[in-house]
């Protein structure tokens, strides 16, 4: 005959009237109908049996905190007793109300038996949330910063944890919020030109960002510069042009060479078979109005565009605030690199962005989808990627290079790389 059943553990380690108790152990046999669970000697039928685990509904019991002995019998063969305790105040979550899955928002955890003020704590996975309002049936909390799509929310009262309810984060909104609310250092360079810089956390990584907003005007002219005779530093090209500020422009490897037009004259016709990753976008300046255009036909298509100044680059990032489907088959898009981008707002303002990278712990850089989301968060409707990596540079007259170019491997302003072209404000 089979030896007497043995109880190894009870889950949970308390008895909640009406709740389910899982009894783990051995020698339970295979017939659930033959099993009874005894609470202080009172027998109740097992509801499930799965190998070493028996499930039973806990009966209404005694007072909260009173100990109770649990045994299991199989065909009259009774186990040794295991001690548990009645808990009538176990918190239970019935739902989570409000919020859009964004950090710092208030959401209400609804349920039962949350106790009086200060008795319960709310956890999003292992992170305790700040409670702003509480009652026996509702706990209003601030959504904590966790970089995950989904977490489990539980309420703990008197050392006992409730059931878990899933909560979803909208990470795109969270990242936008982190970018918008970062501690930006802001300086007006002149009427209609504002420079902002910040160290922040976005996309679950440290970021170093510089942004310039430009309202085009008689005073604020947008131009493209191209060093046809060979590569030159952004600072040299912009300084020689008498610019107020500028960023590095297009790629300059032979097979990525962009079409460039300046003052109505073609200064570089560009490589014919440039891939769309590096050539499906163009900045087009016409009568000092800037457009960011998608050019599926790359350089060949760009040659047909009307404009005073035109520069081809890629990939195209953002159209009417919608992030482009960017190919994931190239690390150019999927890896976090230093980046330079240019975009326009619905009002025709121009946004330049540099994102530093390749400095672990200080500046991680971004993928191109992240760069597109950053440009959208900063207010761009349409945007494109410019050359990045060691080329990423923002130069401002009287200040010099203000971002942290990585070409010298040092987190300073000295690592500028010679580049083929620039976009600048005069």
Task: For the regions a language model picked out, list residue spans one by one.
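Conserved, well-ordered active-site substructure
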Residues: 256-277, 285, 326-382, 386, ...
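Short, surface-exposed charged micro-motifs
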Residues: 45, 130, 211, 282, ...
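Zymogen propeptides
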Residues: 169-275
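Active-site-adjacent helix-turn-beta-strand microarchitecture at beta-sheet edges
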Residues: 250-333
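Ser/Thr/Pro-rich low-complexity tracts
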Residues: 1-174
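Active-site-proximal beta-strand/loop segments in catalytic clefts of secreted hydrolases
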Residues: 215, 246-251, 295, 354-357, ...
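Short, solvent-exposed aromatic-acidic interface loops
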Residues: 226-231, 297-301, 355-360
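Hydrophobic residues embedded in beta-strands of well-ordered beta-sheets
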Residues: 54, 139, 220, 289-291, ...
């Amino acid at each position: 005959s089979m030896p007497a059943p043995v109880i190894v553990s009870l889950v949970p380690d308390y008895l909640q009237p009406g709740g389910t108790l899982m009894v783990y152990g051995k020698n339970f046999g295979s017939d659930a109908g033959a099993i009874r669970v005894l609470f202080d000697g009172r027998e109740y039928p097992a509801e499930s049996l799965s190998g070493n685990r028996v499930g039973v509904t806990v009966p209404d019991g005694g007072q909260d905190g009173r100990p109770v002995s649990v045994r299991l019998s199989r065909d009259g063969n009774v186990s040794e007793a295991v001690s548990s305790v009645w808990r009538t105040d176990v918190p239970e979550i019935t739902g989570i109300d409000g919020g859009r899955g964004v950090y710092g928002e208030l959401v209400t955890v609804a349920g039962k038996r949350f106790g009086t003020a200060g008795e319960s704590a709310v956890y999003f996975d292992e992170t305790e949330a700040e409670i702003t309002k509480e009652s026996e049936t509702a706990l209003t909390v601030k959504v904590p910063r966790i970089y995950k799509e989904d977490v489990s929310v539980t309420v703990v009262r008197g050392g006992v944890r409730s059931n878990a309810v899933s909560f979803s984060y909208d990470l795109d909104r969270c990242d936008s919020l982190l970018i918008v609310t970062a501690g930006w250092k802001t300086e007006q360079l002149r009427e209609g030109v504002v420079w902002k810089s910040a160290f922040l956390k976005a996309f679950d990584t440290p970021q170093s960002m510089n942004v310039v907003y430009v309202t085009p005007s008689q005073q604020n002219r947008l131009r493209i510069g191209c060093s046809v005779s060979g590569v030159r530093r952004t600072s040299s090209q912009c300084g020689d042009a008498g610019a107020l500020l500028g960023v590095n422009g297009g790629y300059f490897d032979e097979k990525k060479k962009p079409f460039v037009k300046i003052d109505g004259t073609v200064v570089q016709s560009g490589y014919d078979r440039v891939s769309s990753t590096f050539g499906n976008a163009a900045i087009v300046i016409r009568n000092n109005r800037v457009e960011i255009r998608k050019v599926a036909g790359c350089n060949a298509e760009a040659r047909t565009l009307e404009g005073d100044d035109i520069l081809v680059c890629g990939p195209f990032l953002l159209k009417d605030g919608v992030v482009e489907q960017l190919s994931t088959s190239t690390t150019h898009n999927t890896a976090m690199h230093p980046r330079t981008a240019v975009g326009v707002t619905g009002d025709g303002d121009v946004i330049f962005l540099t994102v530093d990278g390749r400095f672990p712990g200080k500046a991680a850089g971004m993928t191109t989808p992240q760069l597109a989301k950053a440009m959208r968060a900063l207010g761009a409707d349409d945007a494109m990627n410019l050359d990045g990596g060691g080329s990423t540079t923002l130069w401002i007259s009287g200040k010099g290079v203000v971002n942290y170019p990585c070409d010298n491997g040092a987190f300073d302003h000295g690592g500028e790389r010679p580049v083929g072209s620039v976009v600048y404000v005069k």
